[in-house]
Each structure stands twice: as C-alpha cells, then as structure tokens.
From Swiss-Prot:
Subunit structure: Tetramer of two alpha and two beta subunits.
GO CC terms, sorted: cytoplasm
InterPro entries (alphabetical): aa-tRNA-synth_II (IPR006195), aa-tRNA-synth_II/BPL/LPL (IPR045864), Phe-tRNA-synth_IIc_asu (IPR004529), Phe-tRNA_ligase_II_N (IPR004188), Phe_tRNA_ligase_alpha1_bac (IPR022911), Phenylalanyl-tRNA_Synthase (IPR002319), tRNA-bd_arm (IPR010978)
Protein's organism: Desulfitobacterium hafniense (strain DSM 10664 / DCB-2)
Top-level class of the enzyme under EC nomenclature: ligase
EC numbers: 6.1.1.20
UniProt cofactor note: Binds 2 magnesium ions per tetramer.
Gene expressing this chain: pheS
GO MF term (any one): phenylalanine-tRNA ligase activity
NCBIfam families, per database record: pheS (TIGR00468)
Name of the protein in question: Phenylalanine--tRNA ligase alpha subunit
Length: 340
C-alpha cells in the first residue's frame, strides 16, 4: 500500500509539470485529492490494516498530501504569472493613439453658491451646524416665539406629517438645538445650511428650496456687529463695490428686525429693470435675537444678546448668475447647467 501511495505521488508530480492551464491544474487536483480522488481512496483502505499499521500508513498518506499540495501552490503561481504575462502581451496599448476625452461633469450652481457662502462665513469664524429636515412643531415654531394660533404662522404654508411633526419651513430650528446643546458655552457662532419646505411653486418660489441661516450669541453683541458681518458677506459674494442697507421689518424671532438690500449688481444703484428702478435688491432677513428665543435656547436674555440672519440660496444664485426663473435650477437641463 505504501508503494501505491508513492506511485501516486510520483505520477502526480510528473503530471503537474505537464499541466499548462489553471483549469487543467484544478482538474488534476480534484482527480487526486478530491472526495473520489486516487489519494483519498487510499485512506479508505486503512480499515483493512491492523491497529499497529494504521497510524504508520496514515502518516505516509498525510505526508504525500502535504508534498502534493505544496507542489500545487508552486505550479499555480507559475501558471498565474505566465497567464498574466500572456495577457499583458496580448492587450498592449498603443500609447501613440490620441486619447478620447470623457464628458466633464459640472458642479450644480446651487452647490457652488452654498459652498461659497460656507467658505465666506467659515473665514469669519462661524461653524457649520445641521439638523433634521423632519422637525417637531416645537422647534420649528414654538421655540422661535411662534406659539400655536400665532397669526404669523399664516405667513408660511407648511407640510404637516402629523399634528406635531412637519417638514421644516426654515433652518432656524437648528439654532435652538445648537443653543440647547452648547449652553452655557459662549460664543454661539454658527451658520445652518439645508433644505426647507413650503407650499409655494412659481417662477420665484419652489416647494423645496435651500436656506442658510446664521446665529451669533455672546455678551455685548450689537446691531452694528450684524451690519458689519452682512456688509462683508455681500462684498465677498457680489463684489467689493457693493453697499447694503437695512430696512425695518418684522420677524417673530428677532427684535428689532430688518430686511437687508444690496446695491444692484447690474446698475450699481442707478436704477434698472432688475432692481425695478430702486437701485437696491433684497437678499436676506435679519435682526437681533428676540429675548424669548434666547430663553428658549437656555441663555439669559438679560446678560446676553445676539443676532440672526437668513437667506434663500436660490435667490442668491439667481442674483449672482442672472437667472430669471428659479425652476431652471431644478429642471436638470444640461444646456443650462453646463454654463456653470
């Protein structure tokens, strides 16, 4: 029986040298070491041996198996290397041929504007904060000084999921969540970019649009600080020659409140069809944070003050690039998008 095992070993080693493909190598392995292989069959003969002979014969078979498996590994490496060299030889590339350029992608104008806004405010020391788009009525309205049945709620048509859950109508809830999380640390200095949802759909409105809101809370924050920040932003976004003006307005979460206009990019303030002859274009809303909002965020309104502002990214993009219809930003028309 030992002679038979040695014969299988010698024949198999000889056949290994004749094998020329990985497929044939695998077939030979199954033929010898598989469940019905010739070497495996030798193990079944152990039942006819005496108890003294069995361990000796088993050791011979196992040693032979180890020798063959090592030989298989070496031969497999040789064949794999040969196959790779053959493939490289057959698949040579003619590098003298002219290359074929792939279509180049374009960054969406909204993405470009959002990243530019973030870059500007990060340079001023603000941090980026984010929050959920599906929001509770408390964070979206009540914590922002808009209790239930407040008349100002009619300013926004909201998408409610349940009586207490809705798609956020602004990114302001992130400000409350950040104040709650950060208190009592100062300063709070964040911008909140994100998607918001309102029931509007026309040339200048979309049911889903993007906002960037900002918040700063600390000791001694004044309206002049707000104006300085927004003036710097406007000049970095629209050009160094831009001026801004603040017009009195009303927002439930700020007091005093102001709409912010920038001098017209087209006429420089002389008056044209874009600015409707006024020389000014509205870009965002702002104001000093209402004391109640500070209290809802966990800060002492007698010791601290703050300012907030918010802008629609689509409006900023339309003004920056001269886009007249907001819906173009969402139509996925490559003729339009490839211009940016």
């Amino acid at each position: 029986m030992k002679q038979e095992v040695h014969r299988i070993q010698e024949e198999t080693l000889a056949e290994l040298q004749q094998v020329s493909t990985l497929e044939a190598l695998q077939e030979l392995k199954v033929k010898v070491l598989g469940k019905k292989g010739s070497l495996t069959a030798q193990l079944r003969k152990m039942g006819g041996l005496s108890p003294e002979e069995r361990p000796i014969f088993g050791q011979v078979v196992n040693e032979t198996r180890d020798i063959l498996e090592a030989a298989w590994v070496r031969r497999e490496e040789e064949l794999s290397q040969a196959a790779m060299l053959k493939q490289l030889e057959e698949e040579k590339l003619d590098i003298s041929l002219p290359g074929v350029s792939l279509p180049r992608g374009h960054q969406h104008p909204l993405t470009k504007v959002i990243e530019e806004i973030e870059e500007i405010f990060l340079g001023m020391g603000f941090q980026i904060a984010e929050g959920p788009e599906i929001e509770s009525d408390y964070y979206n309205f009540e914590a922002l000084n808009l209790p239930k049945d407040h008349p100002a709620r009619e300013m926004q048509d909201s998408f409610y999921i349940t009586e207490e859950i809705l798609l956020r109508t602004q990114t302001s809830p992130v400000q409350i969540r950040t104040m709650e999380k950060q208190r009592p640390q100062l300063p709070v200095k964040i911008i909140c970019p994100g998607k918001v949802y309102r029931n509007d759909d026309d040339a200048t409105h979309s049911p889903m649009f993007h906002q960037v809101e900002g918040l700063m809370v600390d000791r001694g924050i004044r309206m002049s600080d707000l104006k300085g920040i927004l003036l710097s932003f406007s000049r970095m976004m629209f050009g160094e020659s831009r001026e801004i003006r603040l017009r009195p307005s009303f927002f439930p979460f700020t007091e005093p409140s102001a709409e912010v206009d920038v001098s017209c990019m087209l006429c420089g303030g002389a008056g044209c069809r874009i600015c409707k002859g006024t020389g000014w274009i509205e870009i965002l809303g702002s104001g000093m944070v209402h004391p109640r909002v500070l209290e809802m965020g966990g800060y002492d309104s007698k010791e601290l003050t703050g300012f907030a502002f918010g802008m629609g990214v689509e409006r900023i993009a339309m003004l920056k690039y001269g886009i007249e219809d907001m819906r173009l930003l969402f139509d996925n028309d490559l003729r339009f998008l490839q211009q940016f």
